[in-house]
């Protein structure tokens, strides 16, 4: 089995097992479909289909943290769709739309990045807990996927330690611990 290309089917099936309500399954299937469409042809870390990342973010929340919340899982699946395309997420409900909007990092040039990141993480630290959960699960998957990519990992690790670790500590001890372990494993 090629993990990079088979993961979307198996990973999504595994995600759905946590939800018994038919309406939840339909919502998750629609969100997964849109995320798959938006990210078609895109690679995460230049090495695997981008949808794998979105699925792992949802799985971190649903399986690792046991947050069995359909709208939160939909937001996790869709968390990078606003960055990739100008999608209207209102059809997924106001809560999903606001979580994704809050978790979306602004696109900036390299010169503006430090200042904008400072503002962004200040804003997200004041955002509802759901948005912080999605952002933290997103970063946790990003850190975990940096193993073996030393050049890129150094900058990502520094940014994570400066902005994301304090956010994790203020949001959920379990996420803070998982993030600390993932950062340690980058050494």
Indicate where each model-derived feature is located.
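Active-site helical microenvironments for divalent-metal-assisted chemistry
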Residues: 1-187
């Amino acid at each position: 089995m090629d993990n990079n290309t088979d993961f979307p089917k198996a990973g999504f099936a595994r995600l759905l097992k946590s939800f018994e309500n038919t309406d939840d399954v339909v919502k998750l299937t629609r969100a997964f479909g849109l995320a798959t469409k938006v990210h078609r042809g895109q690679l995460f870390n230049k090495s695997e289909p981008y949808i794998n990342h979105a699925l792992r973010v949802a799985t971190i929340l649903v399986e690792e943290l046991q947050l069995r919340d359909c709208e939160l899982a939909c937001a996790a699946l869709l968390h990078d769709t606003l960055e990739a395309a100008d999608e209207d997420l209102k059809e997924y409900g106001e809560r999903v739309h606001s979580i994704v909007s809050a978790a979306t990092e602004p696109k900036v040039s390299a010169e503006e990045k430090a200042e904008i990141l400072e503002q962004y993480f200040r804003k997200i630290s004041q955002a509802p807990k759901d948005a912080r959960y999605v952002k933290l699960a997103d970063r946790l998957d990003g850190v975990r996927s940096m193993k073996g990519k030393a050049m890129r990992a150094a900058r990502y690790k520094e940014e994570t330690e400066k902005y994301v670790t304090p956010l994790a500590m203020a949001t959920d001890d379990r996420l803070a611990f998982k993030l600390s372990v993932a950062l340690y494993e980058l050494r």
